[in-house]
Structures are given as C-alpha cells and as structure tokens.
Amino acid sequence: MQKLQTVNAETLLYEPLEKPSFVVDSLIPTGLSLFCGSQKIGKSWLMLKLCLCVSQGIPLWDMPTMEGDVLYLCLEDTFCRIQDRLFRLTDEASGRLQFAVACLKLSDGLIVQLEDYLKDYPDSRLIVIDTLQKVRTASKDNAYASDYGDISLIKDFADRHSLAVIVVHHIRKQNDSDVFNKVSGTTGLTGSADATFVLEKEKRASDTAKLYVTGRDTPYQEYTLRFRDCRWELVERKTQEQLAKETIPDVLFRLVDFMRDKEEWIGTATELLAAMGETETIPTVITKWLNEYRTTFLSENRICYQYSRRKDGRRIALARRAGDSGDGGDSDIRIPPCYCH
C-alpha cells in the first residue's frame, strides 16, 4: 500500500512554495479551465485568438501572455475551416501553434496521446480541447461521478505538467441568476475545474457578450466583449471589487459627502434624510443600508455607525474616525454612550 504523504503546518507556514502561474496574466491559470457558452456564440474564434497570442507571446486584451508551444484540438472542425479562420485573424502565424482535428477518447487513451505530444513539444504552455463531448464516451455510471471522473483525468494531466488546459463546453438554455449553474452537466465539472468561464449574450443577434470568470486562483471578474470582424474585442473589464461597489446604493455615497465636514451626527433616520435633502429614500431602507454596509463601505470611508432603541425613539449615531492613520480602530469615535449599545 502506498504511504500517505503529509506536510506539517510549520513547513507550510515557513517554506516558500511556488504560486500558480498564469498563461494569460490574471485570467487563465495553469491547471484545468472550463470555457462554456451556447452553440455558435463564437467560442472557437476566441479560443483561436487566445492560441495565437500565447504561441507568439503577444498580449490578449492588453494582458501579458506566457509564450510557449500551443496545441488546439479542433474536434468539431476541419483543417480547411481552421485555415479560413486564420486568414481572418492574422497575417502572421507561429510554428509553435499546432492543430489536430481528431484524437482518442478519454477512455481510449487521450491522456497517453497528450503525454506523447509533450515529449515532442516540452515547452508547451497551453492545450485547448474543443469540445469536451468529443473526448467523452457514453456512460451508465452516476452522472456526477462520470463528470468528475472525466474532468479529473484532464486536470491531473494539467497539474503534472504545470500547463493550462482549456476544455470547451456548452451551457444549458435556462434562466438562472448564477450563470455558472447553466454549465451543461453536473457540478462535478465545475467542481473539479480550477477556473470556469461562461460566455453569454443577452440576445442572440447581439454583437456584445459578457464573459464571466471565477476560479480557485482567479478572482471573480466580468468582461464585456464585442464581436467585430471575427474578433472578440474587449469593451470593459470589471474586477470583483468594482462590481461590489456598483451594488452600493447611491445615497451612501452622498452620506459620505454629508459627513465630510462633521465629526459626528446623531438623530433619527427621518432626521438624517431631511438633513441630507433626500426625498427618494425611506427611513427603514436607509437604516437597513447603514447596517448592511457599516463594516465595508462605511468603514472604508472612516465612518462609524451605531443604532439604538430608546424611549424617545430609535437613534442613529454616525461619527468620522479622526486622523488619516487608516488603522480602522474605534478609539477616536466620540458618540455619546446613551445612544450606543
């Protein structure tokens, strides 16, 4: 029996370990990524552009790439169709980008095929499998176990060789507030992947789409893309922090301005709204928002919020933290204790 390999906490705490690297900076990590979208949305155009960028070491949407050999398994295409796409995308191509239109199934030896490929191309950085369904075989096993087992074979291969493998897959036609729930199959697929990408249009005929990104080493991001002249162009990129700020009610930004020249403010929610000249927000809502954002947005803007119920009514206490030390402490807050718990 193989002995269990363990690492103690002290070693993990002090030993420098190599961090995951990115084939496309801050976007595509080494390991396994799922790239999902509806049929005919333009996934293959984006994958080809990505492969061209990595093979030539040129940026993708101003993000640096790690140059190296690239293999693109175009399993739903022909070489003629790939050639037509190349004509449209580039005047120059690198010999470091290889294409194949057929390969073995996972159950028949695909991983062995890929291992042999790496012997000839040891400087490989990226492999794209387009699509997942083309390398799978029908299974009578539990759907989750089948999904997890298939994707884990590819992930283990990617991890062994510290390269990025992107598996192209489809999404279901269903409404869901979480786009990642639309990925076809069970959570065994997304659960095993290091990163998941979903490319989605609001309307089929639209030339713009959203690319949603999440992963273990990849922070949540949203990209707005426009498809023009067979290319996906970047319109806007939003990080998790930027998206979080977009959910902050506008009235709280005005509250920060209101408190800018005040040490403290004490009164009811109704009095606060009147003092700010707010007519569109009701007292119960402003009270809820103050509590919801007190440890995030308000704290980041050096505003402390406290709330109390007394015989003479419900009171709100706001105070600006004095100084610019940014230590986040409450030692400078001067709110009368009768209003605080």
Could you describe each region identified by the protein language model?
Residues 46, 50:
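Hydrophobic positions on the alpha1 helix immediately C-terminal to the Walker A/P-loop
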Residues 88-96, 186-190, 297-298:
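Short, conserved catalytic or adaptor-binding loops enriched in Gly and charged residues
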Residues 121, 157-161, 301:
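Helix C-cap/helix->beta junction micro-motif
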Residues 29-33, 68-69:
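Pre-Walker A (Motif I) flank of P-loop NTPase domains
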Residues 2-4, 10, 17-19, 23-24, ...:
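Conserved inter-motif catalytic segment of the P-loop NTP-binding fold
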Residues 225-341:
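DNA transaction DNA-binding modules
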Residues 34-36, 40, 44-45, 73, ...:
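Phosphate-binding/switch region of NTP-binding enzymes
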Residues 55:
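Gly/Ala-rich phosphate-binding loop of Rossmann-like dinucleotide-binding domains
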